[in-house]
Amino acid sequence: MTAASHQQCPKCAYVRQEQDTAPEWQCPRCGVAYDKIITAPPADPGAPRKPGASAVARSRGQRFKAFRVTVLLIILIFVGTDTWLTRLRATSWGHPLRVVVYPINGDGSEAAAHYIAKLDVTRFAAIERIVKQQALHYGITLEDPMDIALAKPVNSIPPLPLRDGNMLKTIVWSLRLRLWASKWDGYGGPTPEVRAFTLYYDPKTHPVLEHSTGLEKGMIGVIKLFASDKMTAENNIVMLHELLHTLGATDKYDLRTDQPIYPDGYAEPDLQPRLPQHKAEIMAGRIPLAPNRAEIPDSLADVVIGPKTAHEIGWIK
């Protein structure tokens, strides 16, 4: 084997072989004169191959993804444990459930700003009354099972839930919401078990509102309401529905048709004849009147908390 063997052409990268007849100074393939001699070692089929740049990048990406998932799981375990303990204390009903309302101008309107400016805690008195009345029915004898307080307005819109998010995106949204809530928790009184961020909208420009959200993991409500004195009764129904969601209550209506589901979505499931009903189960949200027909109650006076919901929030063990 001569010294010129295995020389690599700087132009075409051809590695010179012993049998090549071209002059040693010239590439047998492209004919260029060598201006640089590169000694390449003989190819060894059994030698391990170094990974390319793309393989290295993929490996790094996979390690980073695994790291992110691990960190996310650690955060979820920590947050989940804290949430579980908070909910356990809240649903033991050994003391009043502390709820703090944080009003937000949802649409930036003057109507919502004016409504929030004159908002006071008496607007939620009907919620406290119905909870006390229904709790007594299930043997909860606290003087005030639910204690609602009002915080200063919040000048920020919370992260809104994704309509078609997958499980991972929903988890990330939940964590973002809890982080956002911790930044805007400016209430100066006792730490609340439930935080209700109420977004108010001008009913003239928003005659129909999107769904509200009651998050059990974190015990946070993002509740969309009308900035109108005339809509107080309707607002209170929506608000109580979402507050009970934060305590673990589930919906009791068909998500496709909005019709109450029998029997848990009926205020009087044993009534004969079954229809029409006279009141609404709070987590069903409507009074069943006839097959495939139900109406929204006028106020909380037309609402009950059924046995299934009472069990979910800890009133029935």
Model region roles, listed by residue range:
Residues 6, 24:
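Residues immediately within or flanking Cys/His clusters that coordinate Zn2+
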Residues 59-72, 77-189:
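Propeptide-to-catalytic entry region of secreted or membrane-anchored zinc metalloproteases
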Residues 39-49:
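Short, intrinsically disordered terminal segments enriched in charged and Pro/Gly residues
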Residues 52-81, 212-216, 221, 226-230, ...:
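Metalloprotease/metallohydrolase-associated module, dominated by Zn2+-dependent proteases
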Residues 179-255:
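Active-site-proximal segment of zinc-dependent metalloprotease catalytic domains
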Residues 31-40:
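Short Cys/His-rich micro-motifs in 6-15 aa windows
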Residues 11, 29:
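Short, cysteine/histidine-rich loop/knuckle motifs that typically chelate Zn2+
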Residues 13-18:
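Short Cys/His-rich zinc-binding micro-motifs
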